[in-house]
């Protein structure tokens, strides 16, 4: 007996965290050089200084929509873990098909 009593959770099965760290200002993690690299990959030569904040805003809205759809697929399947296929289907729904992740 491990001394956990009835209904004790096994290893790695901890309950929900009581205090969750509030995530804010993480969009600044998309750095100026990262946006510049993406633009270079797209064939851009010179970039205006105002582009960086605008790109962060557009990316945030896009990811919010994709994540919302992926979580909807997960909840419909009565799962708690978002799979790669949920994200693929969410992207496909927003007409941006992604290859190489199954399906």
UniProtKB/Swiss-Prot annotation:
The modification N-acetylthreonine is found at residue 2. The lineage of its organism: Eukaryota, Metazoa, Ecdysozoa, Arthropoda, Crustacea. Core component of nucleosome. Nucleosomes wrap and compact DNA into chromatin, limiting DNA accessibility to the cellular machineries which require DNA as a template. Histones thereby play a central role in transcription regulation, DNA repair, DNA replication and chromosomal stability. DNA accessibility is regulated via a complex set of post-translational modifications of histones, also called histone code, and nucleosome remodeling. Keywords: Acetylation, Antibiotic, Antimicrobial, Chromosome, DNA-binding, Methylation, Nucleosome core, Nucleus. It is found in: Nucleus; Chromosome. This is Histone H4. The modification N6-methyllysine is found at residue 32. SMART domains: H4, TAF. The modification N6-acetyl-N6-methyllysine is found at residues 6, 13.
């Amino acid at each position: 007996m491990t001394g956990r009593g009835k209904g004790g959770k096994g290893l790695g099965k901890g309950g929900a965290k009581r205090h969750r760290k509030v995530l804010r200002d993480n969009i600044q993690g998309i750095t100026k050089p990262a946006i510049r690299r993406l633009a270079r990959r797209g064939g851009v030569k010179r970039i205006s200084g105002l582009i960086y904040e605008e790109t962060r805003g557009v990316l945030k809205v896009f990811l919010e929509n994709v994540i919302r759809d992926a979580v909807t697929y997960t909840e419909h399947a009565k799962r708690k873990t978002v799979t790669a296929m949920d994200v693929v289907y969410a992207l496909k729904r927003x007409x941006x098909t992604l290859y190489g992740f199954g399906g």
